[in-house]
């Protein structure tokens, strides 16, 4: 080893072999970070042919990290193979003669890298030009090398042609098999000088060292967010592009990350491996279990920096913070109404489509929102599980309890930007704001009369239908409005209806 920046590997020639004397950069690995053994081949630009395609594909240190992680198949321009490699692990690690010397004129004018064949130089130039002539017919994703396209297409076909002889586990890419085989050999020649942890691959060590240095070399050009690993960066980019390349074969639902698809597949399999030790309730995702367990512990680890209010979930905190900022980033394309959460917008869209996917099994009544269905079911069971700790009054829904508790605290967190009047609930504020805007979104289907509140529309409809839902408990006389019943009951000397 010459210095922290480079080293020379020499192999004594035997019969039928030639001397290999290669010097390359170690891309920032400090002295001592690379130890002996076969890991040394991962730092050489040229690898003896009989070392196997697996070793040749690992020839350039850091190449896999720069181009997308350890699972990347190198193209011919990188020293890999353009086409399928061996279908199982290499038979041996014996050495063969070094590759042929470069042909005259096979040197890149951009970076000076030399190649043994002109075809490799042509393919290498795509690194500089950004050309990607190989397009996937399934999803349209493009690649610079045909070998990368072949590997990518196995995502769609599910093909995993590279099987481990030790355990039978199969992989889409040969480089993934080579990486996996290190778990059997136990060989970890690359040691971190900061913490002493050892790794089987130099590229993994390079990635690991970023946990010590805090380096984040992958920056998003859209929002400036930086990442330590290219794989995390690529997943983040899908937030901007909307790409969801991982689709469920059972229902077609697509996901931006393969891990999310794996979690989703458990729904079809009926698997709920994460059970609550307190009540036995099981969940598909461990995150769901973590959130649920806070209902037993009353833990609320996400406090608001503005007002100190704490929440069980980070998404609840994010939603709450928008009550301070007034931000409503999710806008309906039909009517322009904006919402704090994307899930609220999805539910609101059903107002325009008329979709009511949540039906009651008891009476068949359908609802656009699942929360409304759950609340409705309690009208059949009579359950009111949400009780006020101050006065004992019980409610069918948690939102009803939350709204009621403000009557004890006197808190009115929702203020009108026009006149400053404050309200206990956001729905009350929205109704009030219509007085300023003149909006009357609730229109009678019988006479086209419009109203500010839905309750006013429901009351008005009874003039058309003749419905009288409020009956006197003394004499049985029915009324269309509660206020009329209250007036009537005074004649009996009784109290007004609650």
From Swiss-Prot:
One of its GO biological process terms is: regulation of transcription by RNA polymerase II
Q: Name one Pfam family in it.
A: zf-C2H2
Q: Which GO terms describe its molecular function?
A: DNA-binding transcription factor activity; RNA polymerase II cis-regulatory region sequence-specific DNA binding; zinc ion binding
Location(s), subcellular:
Nucleus
Zinc finger, C2H2-type: residue spans? Answer: 106-128, 134-156, 162-184, 190-212, 218-240, 246-268, 274-296, 302-324, 330-352, 358-380, 386-408, 414-436, 442-464, 470-492
Q: Where is this region: Disordered?
A: 30-104
Stated role: May be involved in transcriptional regulation.
| Family the UniProt entry places it in | Belongs to the krueppel C2H2-type zinc-finger protein family.
Q: Know the name of this protein?
A: Zinc finger protein 497
Species assigned in the record: Homo sapiens (Human)
Gene coding for it: ZNF497
